[in-house]
């Protein structure tokens, strides 16, 4: 399945820094320090992306991560205030389970998953992070779970049924 490219210039994107980490490369003369940043961007209206950036200074790492996140935007199908169905996303040793929730529930999610869900524009959702809690892997596992979501119309078309038969 080929993802259609989303133009970030057309969207009013907000960004949120999920994690900043100091990383070191050991060389002959000692350690070379750099900073690694993970950023999530979204328009709170069904578009979200995550990016990773590394640089000698924190602001540069964040800027690079934002640019990377804008290159990896995905569209999330939202039904009312929640998602259409359950999904499980896997990335590395992290697994994230996302479930639709009734209106008024709110975003029940941990730090990294919460950032992705809120910037995607999902108002009501239940999530569970399983396995590794490494923020980078959790963010990517959440994005993988959101990529699996299909609109009810798409499911009906794929099964060769009417929308009423699917929703009942």
Swiss-Prot record:
UniProt function note: With S4 and S12 plays an important role in translational accuracy. Located at the back of the 30S subunit body where it stabilizes the conformation of the head with respect to the body.
Keyword annotations from UniProtKB, A to Z: Ribonucleoprotein, Ribosomal protein, RNA-binding, rRNA-binding
Domain notes: The N-terminal domain interacts with the head of the 30S subunit; the C-terminal domain interacts with the body and contacts protein S4. The interaction surface between S4 and S5 is involved in control of translational fidelity.
InterPro entries: Ribosomal_Su5_D2-typ_SF, Ribosomal_uS5, Ribosomal_uS5_bac-type, Ribosomal_uS5_C, Ribosomal_uS5_N, Ribosomal_uS5_N_CS, Ribsml_uS5_D2-typ_fold_subgr
Record family assignment: Belongs to the universal ribosomal protein uS5 family.
Pfam family, one: Ribosomal_S5
GO molecular function (one): rRNA binding
Oligomeric form and interacting partners: Part of the 30S ribosomal subunit. Contacts proteins S4 and S8.
Protein name (database record): Small ribosomal subunit protein uS5
The species this protein was found in: Caldicellulosiruptor saccharolyticus (strain ATCC 43494 / DSM 8903 / Tp8T 6331)
Domain S5 DRBM: 13-76
Cellular component terms (Gene Ontology): small ribosomal subunit
Gene that encodes it: rpsE
Record-level GO BP terms: translation
